[in-house]
Structures are given as C-alpha cells and as structure tokens.
UniProtKB/Swiss-Prot annotation:
It comes from the Eukaryota. One of its GO terms (biological process) is mRNA processing. This is Pre-mRNA-splicing factor SYF2. Belongs to the SYF2 family. Keywords: Coiled coil, mRNA processing, mRNA splicing, Nucleus, Spliceosome. Involved in pre-mRNA splicing. GO terms for cellular component: catalytic step 2 spliceosome; post-mRNA release spliceosomal complex; Prp19 complex. Residues 66-80, 94-117, 153-164 have a biased composition (Basic and acidic residues). The gene is SYF2. Residues 66-164 are annotated as: Disordered. PANTHER family: GCIP-INTERACTING PROTEIN P29 (PTHR13264), PRE-MRNA-SPLICING FACTOR SYF2 (PTHR13264:SF5).
C-alpha cells in the first residue's frame, strides 16, 4: 500500500511539473529557433556564394515540388475568394451564390408585362407549381446542409455533457475559461487520488 501511495505521489508531482510548463511558449520558442537556423543556413550559403533556394530544392523531387506549388496556388485562390471574414461579406457571398443559381422565368415575366399585371398593385398573384417546387427544393436543400454541418460538428463528442445546442455552447465557453483550473481535479478524480 505504501508503494502505491508513493507512486501516486510521484505521478502527481510529474503531472504538476508538466502543467507548469507552458506548451504554447515552448512551441513558440521552437518555431523561433527553427527560423533562426533557417536564416543562419541562408546567410552561410550566401557567404559561400551558393544559391540557397537551389540547394534546398535538391532535397525534393519534381513531383513533390509540383504538388507543393499546386497546394500553394489552391490556398492563394481560396484566400482571394474568401476575403475578410465578417458577417456582411459572408452574407454578400451567400447572396451572390444564391443569385447565380437563381433562374428567372422570363417568359412568364414578359406575359405579365404585356397584360399589365406586373405594374398594377393586386393581391391575386398565384405562383406556378414549378416556382413552388423550386422554392421547396431550395428550402429543403438548405435545411439538409445545416443538419449535415450540425451532425459533423457534434460527431467528435465522446460523451454528451449538454441538453441542447445552446447548453453545449455555454459548456464549451465554460471549458475554455476554467479548464486550466479544473483539469488537475478531473485528472486526480480519474486517477483515484482526489482529496
């Protein structure tokens, strides 16, 4: 029994030491170190009179280089299409996408224009069955897309700690705020060393 308590205590101290280490700061430090090494190699190659980019390209095959260029091009296209991510630009893109898929019935419009029904205010307009079908199909398509996204977003949950979507959002917000404080308690509870 004494061995188990000492091993638990050692594990507790190791975990506490790991918690004190800031993983984000370590990653930042490592990235800066890699950038510094890269710059050092570049300067050394320039001092020797070598073409640094050409020397680096020796490590890659032609296929890898082409795939990398294609990947960069796709990323550049995505970034240029997406632009700034705010609600008004997102709504504008959705509107333009819907407008591009919208096919107006010009024949019916011309007939209404000739008869004068288009310009007189009246409440006796009845849409055609085709127009109603298009409306219903558009609405069901949007609903299916929203449900698909909702299912994909919830697929990664191991166990449900919520009763509705709003409650799930609230719980996620709490987790972001308090996980750093409650992680140790949860780990102790799972390990069986809770006080």
């Amino acid at each position: 029994m004494n061995d188990s308590s000492t091993s638990n205590r050692k594990a507790l101290f190791e975990e506490d030491k790991d918690l004190k280490v800031n993983k984000r700061a370590d990653a930042l430090l490592e990235r800066k170190q890699q950038e510094a090494e890269f710059e050092l190699e570049k300067l050394q190659a320039e001092e020797r009179g070598e073409d640094f980019d050409r020397k680096r390209a020796w490590d890659w095959t032609v296929k890898e280089t082409e795939e990398w260029k294609e990947k960069k091009e796709r990323k550049r296209e995505r970034e240029s299409q997406s632009g700034v991510h705010d609600m008004s630009s997102t709504a504008q893109r959705a509107y333009e996408k819907d407008l591009a898929s919208f096919k107006p019935d010009l024949e019916t419009y011309e007939k209404e224009k000739e008869t004068g029904l288009h310009h007189t205010p009246s409440f006796n307009h009845k849409p055609t069955p085709e127009a109603l079908d298009r409306l219903v199909n558009g609405l069901t398509k949007g609903d299916k897309q929203r449900m698909k996204r909702r299912k994909q977003a919830g697929a990664d949950d191991q166990h449900a700690t919520y009763i509705s979507d709003k409650n799930k959002q609230f719980n996620e917000k709490l987790n972001r705020q308090y996980d750093k404080y409650t992680k140790e308690i949860r780990d102790n509870f799972e390990r069986g060393t809770a006080l």
